[in-house]
Amino acid sequence: MAGSLSEIKAKIISTEKTSKITSAMRMVSSAKLVKSEQAARDFQIYASKIRQITTDLLKSDLTTGSDNPMLVSRPVKKTGYIVITSDKGLVGGYNSKILKSIMDMIQEYHAAGDYEIISIGSIGSDFFKARGMNVAFELRGLADQPSFDQVGRIISQSVDMFVNEIFDELYVCYNHHVNSLTSQVRVQRMLPISDLVAEEAAEEGVTGFELEPNRHVILEQLLPQFTESLIYGAIIDAKTAEHAAGMTAMQTATDNAKHVINDLTIQYNRARQAAITQEITEIVAGANALE
């Protein structure tokens, strides 16, 4: 009985230590989430402005007949997917949701050689490589608050692959941050930009432009920046969802630890009470035997 009591006590102490760790990790994730949400709000100021300029320019008559490759829809022979996952675990179902979605899409719509994956995050990179899938580029070790300098190269490489017709359309697959408890899987087409033209075509209120030096030069510079801003915005959004998932997972782990501690404490008290009762019974029996 003494051995059982000591084992239960050791489990209680161990679980309490684990609870303190998960509670601290929840607080860290919470702080990261606040910073990421602020970064996302700040970025939206820039993103909304460049979107407005781009869509107004694309809707204007000045862009009619543009041959810019980023605007041209062509027969789809190969598709590119930028897949954003985390570099570490302990984020609940954050990674499994996005990986299941991309696997379902590839199995349903693609043969072995007609897709390319650009993987952001170690979990996704390891997952795809373990299955022998087509990974063109990968980026590991993404910062908690990723700067454009950190991700700019892989974004530019992805856009260049479309422009150079290595693939004919580009999607970004990521978890969209809704709130601290919820995220949604998004598979968003980024290239060609013809989707954006169709979405905005019915809206009124085109801003007038005086274009210098000319339309062609402006589009050559603006469209890559616009597309890169959309992809970067998705990365920020995904990182925010990751921090929220980490916070929720650690809160759940802390709550579960508390339940385990409570159950173990009840078990310990019952075992201790049984041990005391047994000792009293043995003492009384011994005293009666001496009479």
UniProtKB/Swiss-Prot annotation:
GO molecular function: ATP binding; proton-transporting ATP synthase activity, rotational mechanism
PROSITE patterns: ATPASE_GAMMA
SUPFAM superfamilies reported in the protein's UniProt record: ATP synthase (F1-ATPase), gamma subunit
Membrane topology according to the record: Peripheral membrane protein
Gene Ontology BP, a term: proton motive force-driven plasma membrane ATP synthesis
Record-level GO cellular component terms: plasma membrane; proton-transporting ATP synthase complex
A Pfam family annotated for this UniProt entry: ATP-synt
Cellular compartments annotated: Cell membrane
InterPro entries attached to this UniProt entry: ATP_synth_F1_ATPase_gsu (IPR035968), ATP_synth_F1_gsu (IPR000131), ATP_synth_F1_gsu_CS (IPR023632)
CDD domains: F1-ATPase_gamma (cd12151)
Keywords for this protein: ATP synthesis, Cell membrane, CF(1), Hydrogen ion transport, Ion transport, Membrane, Transport
Sequence similarity: Belongs to the ATPase gamma chain family.
Summary of the function given for this chain in its UniProt record: Produces ATP from ADP in the presence of a proton gradient across the membrane. The gamma chain is believed to be important in regulating ATPase activity and the flow of protons through the CF(0) complex.
Quaternary state and interactors: F-type ATPases have 2 components, CF(1) - the catalytic core - and CF(0) - the membrane proton channel. CF(1) has five subunits: alpha(3), beta(3), gamma(1), delta(1), epsilon(1). CF(0) has three main subunits: a, b and c.
Protein name (Swiss-Prot/TrEMBL): ATP synthase gamma chain
Lineage: Bacteria, Bacillati, Bacillota, Bacilli, Lactobacillales
Gene field: atpG
